[in-house]
Amino acid sequence: MIAPPATTLPVIATLTASVLIAAAALAWYRPRSVVDHPLLVLAVPLLLSLLSMAALVDPAGPSLRMRLDPSEEPMLAPDDPGLAPYHRATANFGDDNVYVVAVETAEVFNTEFLLAMQTASNRLRRLKGVRNVDSLVTTTHYGYDNDIDTVLVRRLIDRVPEDLDAMAALRERALSDRVYPRSIVSADGRTAALNISFASMSDGDFVQSGLDESIRAIAIEEFPAPASVYVTGRQHVKTRAHHIMVGDLSWLIPLAMTVGAFVGWLVTGSLRAGFIPVGASVLATLWVFATLAALGRPLNMITLVLGPVLICVGAVYGIHILARYEALVDEGMNARDAALGSLKDTAAPTLMAGATTVAGFASLAGSDIPATQELGLLAATGVAWATVSSLCSIPALLSLLPPRGSRRQTSVGLRANALLRRLLDLIAGLCTRRPLPILAAWALVAVVSAGLLPRIVVDTDYLTFFDPASKVRTDFAAVGRLLTGASPVYVALHGGREGAFREPGTLRALERLQAEVDRVPGVRATTTIVDFIAPLNRAMERGDPSAERVPDSKAGVAELMFMLPRNRVRGLVNSNHSSANLLVRSSATGSAAVRQLEDDLKVAITRAGLPAGMEANVTGNTILLNHGADSLARTQTTIVAFAALAIFVLMARFFRSAGAGLLAMIPNLVPVLVFFGLLGAGVAMLSLATSLLGCVALGMAVDDTAHFLVGYKRRRARGMQAEAAVSDCIATLGKPIVVTSIMLSSGFLVLLLSGFAAFRQLGALAATTMMICLFADLTLLPALLLRFRR
């Protein structure tokens, strides 16, 4: 199926929101219809679920119609001005995919090792999908043969030497070459590389081909211990990411469902509280995934968290409805009346909580990163579905179920409730007696957190998704340490006319630039067309060392260009020689290091003094992905501010008071400020994963605040004093607030079992932030209400 453009997603979100607003209006204005016609109400989500299953499941497999996209492309800003030079460079010189198998041993230049290298190279070249393998035994060498007085263009190793003198001569020839020590053998002769290029294929086709597994298996078989084999490159990393994505998708969602239901049962002692709210959120998640499948949109490295997040976020709405239902049953109401009463009492705060959470997620659409935009829109749609599913389906179902008898709870639930009541009584007493010290303590926390904000480190490196101890990270580091690194950067030069890089003056300017770039910190190796022209010119001049340079005439350059094998220089000069590439190999990782590398390369271009009319661009996938860090830093404040403004407007409209709206925002802004303070304290970096949490936490935190404020206003309207109203709200609403917070935290903690380190960080930070929100709602909000006597 061909995926529609990303602009389809806002359209789908708008249409979905329209349907949900209509359904919400039913719950708000005609609540009696929900319990009067429960079977009809329940038939709607059942029908939607059946349609969703039809969209999700391919019966021919049977298999899911869900695609996974482990690439970096969804994390690249589409309006990045660096995209055009990158596409131009890859059109001229091919893509910057580098796949390296590095083998570390005691000595590369021995007969046994080189024979194994020869066998491995031949086996790899025979794999379907492999275009070329460049290694010591396959690479081309240019030299002058005195005996026959001719220039030889042949393989560096035609036949693996067996005597020591021939092997020593080979070692000297290879390590003194301008190119080999930079790409296929280390300068100390202890590590050799097989650089593999592939036929054109999509990331999905590459994963399905099994090439990554086959290559590693061949390498390990041909180079057994004590040799060490390291594999790295974009295709390898994306393959490992795909496998982790499959694992996360297959069990994090069921685990989130199980944990949510278990926590609900454990805290309340009620199976209904465990399964019904989670069931409503699972339905909403199913509908969102079906929308993705119907659109042909893949899950990427960011939207992968959609399932677990929606399940834990969507379940909280049902908890409040069930808590109110149980309270009304305790007062003697029958099931139908209790269901109707719970719907009437919770509709307003639930709709408000849903709207603010939708606003929090939707604000992610303001990001420059497509993956973040997509997650925001899909999650906002899912939360809207979960809100209405909870408001309509749960009361309809409860009206059909008999109320539980007097022995309604397990012994675990009874003990948990007793402990929770004592804790809430303690908090209520503290808030009513000491509101000012509570406010002072929270003010101190906010000031300290604000002071840590300038220390936040932004990092969007793709490798940070993986654990530092993973093979992906350790192999990447090993290749960077032993050879030249697997992060290629292009310095693409455009001469402005055909044949520009057949001119000696232009090539000498390229040589000057290469010398400047070689001095840049972090650059491990550089390669240009001059590295092939100069040795070949020396060979043409009977091996004269002084002739290892660019020829003086254009005709001389043209002759050498004609002799060079096209497959050796296709990445260094385009077909009509109007453009050339300075290939930079660096082991720089992390946004700060890559940004510094880019800046230093631009300075080197300026120092080189290129001829008038020549254009030079620093580009590459590594550079573009790093631009996401700048975008993230630039837009993070704007996104969170927009979310806060949208939520404030919703709260002010709901309570019909700007003051009440502002009061409601304070206990929700402070936890978000603390979250960013934790980033500034070095707990984690602001990455593509952790950047999701700021505005999302703001939207979710308002849920419990809305329920508390609605309850408080109703009690004040009945004539209660502020202290009594606060105490009663903590005693009666505290339980569902605690349950929902624990359920949210537990749901996010499920991400600790993800195969991606970035998501484990997100899970831990989200769970911590949710607990901070809980303490803010139970202490800071009551203290504010008592201080300002709202």
Regions found by a protein language model. Give the residues of each.
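Interfacial helix-loop-helix hairpins and adjacent transmembrane helices
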Residues: 1-46, 340, 388-446, 464, ...
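Hydrophobic, glycine/alanine-rich multi-pass transmembrane helices and their short helix-loop junctions
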Residues: 2-5, 263, 292, 351-394, ...
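Solvent-exposed, non-transmembrane loop/terminal regulatory segments of multi-pass membrane proteins
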Residues: 41, 56-107, 114, 161-185, ...
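Extracytoplasmic
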Residues: 115, 160-270, 282, 508-511, ...
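Internal alpha-helical transmembrane segments of multipass membrane proteins
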Residues: 246-287, 355-363, 634-670, 674, ...
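Hydrophobic transmembrane alpha-helices and their membrane-interface caps
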Residues: 273-321, 658-710, 776
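Short helical (or helix-break) motifs at transmembrane helix termini and adjacent helical loops
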Residues: 309-330, 350-357, 392-393, 696-715, ...
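Helix-loop junctions and hydrophobic alpha-helical segments within the transmembrane domains
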Residues: 328-355, 716-739
